[in-house]
Amino acid sequence: MNYQTFIFDLDGTLLDTLGDLAASVNYALRTHGMPEHSIDDVRRFVGNGVRKLMQRAVPDGESNPDFEATFATFRQHYLAHSLDTTRPYDGIPGTLEALKARGCRLAVVSNKMMAATHELCRHFFPDTIEVAIGEHEAEGIRRKPAPDTVFAALRQLRVGKEGAVYVGDSDVDIQTAANAGLPCISVLWGFRDRDFLIQHGAKTFISAPSELLL
């Protein structure tokens, strides 16, 4: 693959965050007397940011009078526990190191909270990920699938779209890449399966991180 810049999604692409997300969702629901969800439920809920995650998890979503309190409990718990079980997918650290050694530029764009995005990238990828951008709407950067985070990452890397590719695991990532005018590589080890991704327009797939080096 002859790309010089790689823009990665985080959850389900570089990191398996599902266990910690589900634990924090269920802690918040349990704390506020609401029914909990299975990990497969939470897998379906993720992808559009943590507020949307909790809208899907809380009965009646934002219409529930206890929604904001439950959402606040989730945020507090997740920021304290985002490293409990989260780990890079097999092959990710070595692949990032190999790309970096080739002179490639590497960034992360996520709908995750900015603080958690930075913490996870600093913890797991301190020497490879140059730019990490999380939820930033308060500063006028719309969340994915808007292209704003991708454009912000390219600006911070001081590179253009030429030679850049977006790598993600979801329909949101496919839409984000299209909106940013970038090719998209869909990974098959994440939170969505091949059939789902094909239904949402995926064209290029990889089954292992090392395929990015081919």
Predicted segment positions?
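Active-site neighborhood of HAD-like aspartate-dependent phosphohydrolases
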Residues: M1-R44, Q55-V58
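Substrate-recognition "cap/lid" segment bordering the active-site pocket of phosphatases
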Residues: T85, M113-V165, D171-Q175, N179-A180, ...
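Short acidic-hydrophobic, aromatic-tinged amphipathic segments that line or gate anion-handling sites
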Residues: T204-A208
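Helix-loop "lid/cap" segments that line or gate small-molecule binding pockets
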Residues: A28-L29, G49-S63, A153-L154
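Metal-dependent phosphoesterase signature
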Residues: Q55-G94
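Substrate-recognition element of Asp-dependent hydrolases with the DxDx(T/V) motif
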Residues: V25, I92-R122
